[in-house]
Amino acid sequence: MDLEMMLDEDYKEGICLIDFSQIALSTALVNFPDKEKINLSMVRHLILNSIKFNVKKAKTLGYTKIVLCIDNAKSGYWRRDFAYYYKKNRGKAREESTWDWEGYFESSHKVIDELKAYMPYIVMDIDKYEADDHIAVLVKKFSLEGHKILIISSDGDFTQLHKYPNVKQWSPMHKKWVKIKSGSAEIDCMTKILKGDKKDNVASVKVRSDFWFTRVEGERTPSMKTSIVEAIANDREQAKVLLTESEYNRYKENLVLIDFDYIPDNIASNIVNYYNSYKLPPRGKIYSYFVKAGLSKLTNSINEF
């Protein structure tokens, strides 16, 4: 960091929040073919090289503090306590797949522990919390404190966070800046609340809550008028007027699953406390870790981490 910046009392460090679990998994799916046995060495090399690439990108743009955000479903996600069907389709798809999910997850969990012990990054990893939770809570915190923030993720769910000042999002998958589809962060968010988000098993307010998990062949989701989405996005009180009673009840369910402003206060507090109390390993540990872990090729580029 520039010495002049450090001496400037008004200087606020740029912070990069990396959607670690999404980036690591998407990279692994591209690099490891079906039926190939995945081991710790393979996953370690892939993750460290991915981190190096994204950290270099962030620091080049002036975001010098790096925060890795982890999905931790060891005891199941907290949203599944509220809605049993949440992301249940993913487990079903994994069971039918010939990709080595067990080898990948076992290895990635070990690498996450290594990152906590040896690498100079804050690793946000709390049982039952998703990377989305960490990113949403910390974006709000850092933005209100005056920091500029870079989210590194290809996930379109984060466009609702673009409403905060000084927030940008880079998609490493598409190698471009993520823009709000509708031009409004509020409309993007409300579209998913009302129409649902199939990839997470969240259904439209016009059908039963577990529609995507229990759907039978031939069932369709009724359409939702864009004018209704926009009206409720601009004034949420309109939801009571424009939706039927059953749709309004479903709307309230979807708020908890999709709108980051509805992350429970106790979860947000736990995230902030975890961040504030995190003890960073010294940079001096990187070299010994690389040598011990068989990453000697990376020792020449330690400054890029």
Swiss-Prot record:
It is an enzyme of class 3 (hydrolase). It comes from the Viruses. Its EC number is 3.1.26.4. GO terms for molecular function: 5'-3' RNA exonuclease activity; 5'-flap endonuclease activity; DNA binding; RNA-DNA hybrid ribonuclease activity. The keyword Hydrolase applies. The keyword Hydrolase applies. It comes from Enterobacteria phage T4. Keywords: DNA replication, Endonuclease, Exonuclease, Hydrolase, Nuclease. Plays essential roles in DNA replication by removing the RNA primers from lagging strand fragments. Exhibits 5'to 3' exonuclease activity on either RNA/DNA or DNA/DNA duplexes and endonuclease activity on either flap or fork DNA structures. This is Ribonuclease H. GO terms for biological process: DNA replication, Okazaki fragment processing; DNA replication, removal of RNA primer. Pfam families: 5_3_exonuc_N (PF02739), RNaseH_C (PF09293). SUPFAM superfamilies: 5' to 3' exonuclease, C-terminal subdomain (SSF47807), PIN domain-like (SSF88723). The gene is rnh. It catalyses: Endonucleolytic cleavage to 5'-phosphomonoester.
